[in-house]
Each structure stands twice: as structure tokens, then as C-alpha cells.
Amino acid sequence: MGVRVKRFDLVRVKDSEAYKDSDFVAVEEPLNIRTCFEKCEDFAIIMRTPGDDKELSLGFLYSEGVINSIHDVEDIKQVENNVIEVKLNKPIGIRIRELIVNSSCGVCGRAFLYTLNILKSDLKVKREVIFSFPEKLREKQSVFNISGGLHATALFNPQGELLFIYEDVGRHNAVDKVVGRLLLEDKIPASNYIMQVSGRLGYEIVSKGIKAGIPIICGISAPTSLAIEIAEEAGLTLIGFLRGKSLNIYTHSERIY
């Protein structure tokens, strides 16, 4: 696992007084994802927080449509600190990327929209269970609690148990790590789980969840208009402004009682 935080010297100003200090900062480094079928080729370079690179790579390739399940992958190995190779059992059939994916937007610069899955899930969750998610998320954000600089995504079951959590400088990377974990456990479509994110609910976050078959996505901030529109179309329950004992249900409220 790579280093996730580094300490840097700084000048801190408080109450108009300046003094020398130091602080921990979240690490951001490139990850070169190479896909291998007959020969290995560079597929994408992702700016990310080191660690959980296997989950990130698998989730990213799934979101890109390169793989449909873990059964499309013969092997995955970290050949260097910032290079990972994914051996496939079929050619990828799509053009190799020609851009660096930055940590704030995975689809910036591309005219790319997912073909939406229509979610089929009878999952219903109590409001009181949903209300517990943000605090449970914060308690488990180990790197954020040190540096204050990472996004987090967690997966919960209907009883409110936090199953796993991933952090990254990129909010969509954290989602890809969750999806990658689901792939590794062969749990896609994830029709009996709820995903909680630490930030806003944009199109990309929501579409990745839909593709993984997750029927309920919650965030502590606002959704975008496109996120609401695709959630409605796909049958996703989208919850925003989840804070304390309040929340907004934007689509398919029938799953929350």
C-alpha cells in the first residue's frame, strides 16, 4: 500500500499572527492502468490516492465498459508502485484512452454517457437507518481525519452496517474502488446495498452506482439536475442533503419508509 499522507512545512496564520508549522496533506500520484491481451498496453493514467489500486482499476475498467464482470479478468498485479496490469481473457474492443484522468473528474473532455441500466430491486430501508450513515462514514474516514483532504464512499446493508469504505482525492475514484470491491466479491448487480458518498451527487457518481446495480445512493450535499434525471429514468432512489435527522429524496421515494 502506498503512502496516503505526507507532512509539509507551512506558515499558519491565526488571529492575524503568523507562525511556522507543519501539517499532513493527502497524497496524489498517477496510476498507470495497463490492459493485457496477447500484449500489454497503457489504457489510462488516473490521478489518485495510492492504495486499493486493484479495486480502483477494476471499478474503473467496469465503469468504462472494458469488463462486464470479474470473470473477464484472468489476473491483476501491481508491477510497480504506480503501475498495475490487468490481464483480460478477451480483447477490450474499445479505443485506448489518449488522456490523463484527473482526480476531480473522470470523464472531463469526453462526450460520454452511459447506457443506463434499469434497476430492479425491491429493497426498502428505514429512514432511521439512513440517518445513521453520515456519522458512521465520518468515524471510518481514517485518512480524512488526519489530512482533511479526501472524499469517501461507503457501502451499507439494509440494517445499517457499514460493510466497507474507500477514500481518495477523487470522489469518483472512491466510487470506483467500491465497485471494484463488489466485482472482486462477485456481488454485481448490488441490488441489496446502499451507497453513501461524502460529497455532492453528480452525474458520474450516480451513473457508476447505477451501472453496478446499486438501488439507493445517498450524499450529504446536493445532486445535479442530470443526476436526478438519470436516477428517475433508471429507477434509482437518490437522497441528498443527508444531515442529522433530515434528508431530501429526489427520486423513487417508495424505497424509504
Swiss-Prot record:
Alphabetized GO MF terms: sulfur carrier activity; sulfurtransferase activity
Keywords: Cytoplasm, Molybdenum cofactor biosynthesis
Cellular component aspect of the GO annotation: cytoplasm
Pfam family, one: FdhD-NarQ
Organism in which the protein naturally occurs: Saccharolobus solfataricus (strain ATCC 35092 / DSM 1617 / JCM 11322 / P2)
Name of the protein in its database record: Sulfur carrier protein FdhD
GO BP annotation list: Mo-molybdopterin cofactor biosynthetic process
Keyword Cytoplasm recorded: yes
Predominant cellular place of this UniProt entry's protein: cytoplasm
Localization (cell): Cytoplasm
InterPro entries: Cytidine_deaminase-like, FdhD
Protein family per UniProt: Belongs to the FdhD family.
Residues forming the catalytic site: C105 (cysteine persulfide intermediate)
Highest taxon above the source species: Archaea
Functional description taken from the UniProt entry: Required for formate dehydrogenase (FDH) activity. Acts as a sulfur carrier protein that transfers sulfur from IscS to the molybdenum cofactor prior to its insertion into FDH.
